[in-house]
Amino acid sequence: MTSVSYRPEPGSIPTDPGVYTFRDAHERVIYVGKAKNLRARLSNYFQDLDQLHPRTRAMVQSANHVQWTVVSSELEALNLEYTWIKRFNPRFNVMYRDDKTYPMLAISVKEQIPRAFMYRGPRRKGVRYFGPYPKAWAIRETLESLTRVFPIRTCSAGVYRRHEALGRPCLLGYIDRCSAPCVGKITPEDHRALVDQFSSFLAGNTEPVLRRVRKEMEQASENLDFERAASLRDQLQAMQKSMERQAVVFSDNTDADLIAFVADELEAAVQIFHVRGGRIHGQRGWVVEREDLSEEKLVADFITQFYGETAELAKATETQVGGASGPEVDRDLARAINPAAAQDLGDLVGDVQVTPVPREILVHAMPDDADDLAAWLTSLRGSNMQIRVPQRGDKKALMTTAETNATQALAQHKLKRAGDITARSAALKELQEALWMDESPLRIECTDISHIQGTDVVASLVVFEDGLPKKADYRRYKIRDAAGDGHSDDVASIAEVVRRRFKRYQQDKSAVPAGDDAGDLLEGETELEDNSAEGTDPATEKRKFAYPPQLFIVDGGLPQVNAAQEVLDELGVNDVTLVGIAKRLEEIWVPGEEYPIIVPRNSPALYLVQNLRDEAHRFAITFHRQQRSARMRRSKLDDIPGLGPKRRKQLVKEFGSVARVKEASVEDIAALPGFGPKLAQLIHDALNAE
């Protein structure tokens, strides 16, 4: 019989409800769970390891110790479990990730003149989403039909500005498919009202619009205004055509989500059909590795994760688009939303102002703790909802369809994954053998430097886990000490990046707050140095950068590799394999070795290393271009304290250029609206200082 050494004494575990966490040697949370009875639940993990499910066994063996928190009720445990899963993103908890990015119809409500457009990717604040749609052409046809009725803007910002400057609309404006706000044919307020009607129609509130158009058509016909009656008839047909694309499954105004699971011993597939107003508005699917859980527990975990995520996204977006007088975005809430999960779980049916929890959730198996779950969902929805298992009729038939979809999705996933896993495993195994490593490098990091003649020197750090990019862990650095006049020391730059990366690791490992040497940025986050954003949650930051790779790759040859190794020796890091890849001959260099390792050109291992190097290069160049563009846009006005963007723009618009502002007198500047003598003197002195 085999067991683990950190098993707590059974008598020390309380019998109360609570939440427990398994943590590894780096204090990283790798699993979060809840229980009605902590002692009974935790005892299941410490039986003979050979009797555990493979995934559970791997988790227990990866852990270093277990902790628990007692709460007063099962509902409180449910809330705390969800919060901690969002906070720590444990790798052994099931995360529902979609196998593709479905296109959505998006409306940029944050813009002064909102526009409708097709969109793929993670959800953004200030944008309302409809869908997902199975095909992009379905969105294009929907827009083509509905812009006849709701002629809202669909052009990009560049096209809008161009026609605004020209003073004449585009073709869509001439054929009445756009109300042409760019040339003032409609006021911003009236255009926004039109956008609201368009959004309401897409969200399923179709009857009021249809009644209004039908009444106006009849009135126009009675007034013998046959041209307008014909136009309204065409609008009515366009709306009906758009509605026909959404299959009618129920005769009543059913507002429900149907959730179907199909699982084998290792994996589970889930399909969700979103029904609004009796019509299927969207369909999504996920395939995940299965925990050693019952079907009822799987359903409960999915509902908790999916609806908790969508409710947070809706709340954050509503706060963002609440208007000029509304509150600012809750920073802690926004930071709690995982970007990857936001992409996979946040695609709601309808817009973000429609509650993400429907009146009814239909499942094929009643989830565990259904009453507590329903109470939690009711609090998210703001009104009563129920969870049911359909027994007969149309709802049962649609559940069967959803189960069929889940079965097919699981079969397709297994076929695809068999090939992918085989290739990645072969590459990692070959890399292990080529570099004489004790184990396969499941986490690999790679860094690259980017600059132009020593200016705007930046670096990137990309992360692959299990042979796949983990973009949530990407970093980018502004190099501080390695740049000179017209040149850059790449060797010193590499050394700086390695020092900052592993010094941060040591600080996290010893639970010391990150200092000035830990200045890194996540891809997609605000470009602030040193992670010093106001309100940063130390626990969240620790999760992002808290454990070392098995393999660290630098883009360069022997000088870069030796410099990186000196830094690792200086910091006492001896559990990381370090190599470099030279661009010219694709040679792999090892510290202290006179000759490189030659890996066959057709080797999966070399392909993986090249993929890492190319991704690091792409990420570094992207950041370098951003920095260079920002520098080129800067002027002396940017450095004047108390002079904001609006006033800078006003100065350049009034005087024509920064040079002419410099030539202007204090009196000329002070004469501008909003500029007093004191500010005018400050601007004049700053621009004319030697």
UniProtKB/Swiss-Prot annotation:
GO terms for cellular component: cytoplasm; excinuclease repair complex. It comes from the Bacteria. Residues 207-242 form the UVR domain. Pfam families: GIY-YIG, HHH_5, UVR, UvrC_RNaseH, UvrC_RNaseH_dom. SMART domains: GIYc, HhH1. InterPro entries: GIY-YIG_endonuc, GIY-YIG_endonuc_sf, GIY-YIG_UvrC_Cho, Hlx-hairpin-Hlx_DNA-bd_motif, RuvA_2-like, UVR_dom, UVR_dom_sf, UvrABC_protein_C. The keyword Cytoplasm applies. Keywords: Cytoplasm, DNA damage, DNA excision, DNA repair, Excision nuclease, SOS response. It is found in: Cytoplasm. One of its GO terms (biological process) is nucleotide-excision repair. The keyword DNA repair applies. GO terms for molecular function: DNA binding; excinuclease ABC activity. Residues 15-94 form the GIY-YIG domain. SUPFAM superfamilies: C-terminal UvrC-binding domain of UvrB (SSF46600), GIY-YIG endonuclease (SSF82771), RuvA domain 2-like (SSF47781). PANTHER family: UVRABC SYSTEM PROTEIN C, UVRC/OXIDOREDUCTASE. The UvrABC repair system catalyzes the recognition and processing of DNA lesions. UvrC both incises the 5' and 3' sides of the lesion. The N-terminal half is responsible for the 3' incision and the C-terminal half is responsible for the 5' incision. Interacts with UvrB in an incision complex. Belongs to the UvrC family. NCBIfam families: PRK00558.1-5, uvrC. This is UvrABC system protein C. The lineage of its organism: Bacteria, Bacillati, Actinomycetota, Actinomycetes, Mycobacteriales.
